[in-house]
A protein has these predicted regions:
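Hydrophobic, well-structured mid-protein blocks that either form specific transmembrane helices
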Residues: 89-124
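Short alpha-helical hairpin
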Residues: 11-29
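Divalent metal-dependent phosphate-bond-processing catalytic cores, especially two-metal-ion Mg2+/Mn2+ enzymes
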Residues: 11-14, 32-57, 70, 119-222
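Short amphipathic alpha-helical segments
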Residues: 20-25, 40-47, 62, 67
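His-Asp-centered metal-binding catalytic motifs of divalent-metal-dependent phosphohydrolases/nucleases
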Residues: 61-78, 82, 86, 107-116
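An active-site-proximal "capping" alpha-helix that borders the catalytic cofactor pocket
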Residues: 46-47, 81-96
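N-terminal amphipathic/basic-hydrophobic helices that include classical n-h-c signal peptides
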Residues: 1-9
Length: 222
């Protein structure tokens, strides 16, 4: 992870060694307590994509980096309202005051709260749009794997067929035509990837076959 951040520090931004060390040493380890669909690797991916999107906007890179680091911490209190819990964690973390003003911290908290894909409202700021877009990792195999992993972690008593049906229903509800997935950054590649994924979702038999292969691979890990 440090190599990625060193690369980004070579461009004009305000990421400091102090903030990077704080995030990596104090914040990122908290993701190790979450399920595989929301683990440290996922957080790192969201951080990377968030930083890549900063090249399209005049934004505070340190804030974008911090938003991505905190966006899923509220999972420690459950999934249903994790976005609001994550925002509260930001507001209550006094350590952030050594890096940001109160106004910046409030913007960070708002963006963290706005990141969730099922939110009905548009993110309030460009920071919210960046984290929301970065968290939408539209790569079919990754999405299907994370969906299966989450099901195995949360619903261990389900049969194989029940897991597959749950995964199909979730993927259709979120990514299918008419699903609640919304994209906010026109410069990202997500719109093209989403349409490609929807073509796969349209063929439910193909979707189920792919999920069955992933289920067999992941089941051995649980």
């Amino acid at each position: 992870m440090r190599l990625l951040l060193i690369y980004h520090r070579m461009s004009k931004n305000n990421l400091t060694a102090g903030l990077i060390n704080f995030i990596e040493d104090e914040i990122m380890p908290r993701y190790e307590n979450f399920d595989k669909a929301h683990d440290r690797r996922h957080a790192f991916t969201v951080m990377s994509q968030s930083l890549q999107l900063t090249k399209f906007y005049e934004v505070d890179v340190a804030m974008v980096y911090t938003i991505a680091a905190y966006h899923d911490l509220g999972l420690s209190e459950g999934r249903a309202m994790h976005h609001t819990a994550s925002a509260r964690i930001v507001r209550e973390d006094e350590r952030l005051r050594q890096f940001f003003t109160p106004e910046q911290i409030e913007t960070i908290a708002d963006a963290v709260e706005d990141h969730r894909a099922s939110n009905l409202h548009e993110p309030r700021t460009i920071y919210g749009k960046i984290i929301a877009e970065a968290d939408r990792i539209i790569e079919p195999e990754t999405i299907m794997t994370r969906t299966v992993q989450y099901g195995l972690s949360r619903y261990p008593t389900l049969t194989k067929d029940e897991h597959i049906e749950r995964a199909v229903a979730h993927i259709k509800e979120k990514y299918g035509r008419g699903g609640y997935m919304r994209l906010w950054i026109p410069q990202s590649q997500n719109s093209v990837r989403l349409e490609e994924f929807r073509m796969m979702i349209d063929n439910e038999n193909e979707l189920k076959r792919s999920l069955e292969v992933i289920y067999s691979e992941q089941k051995a890990c649980y």
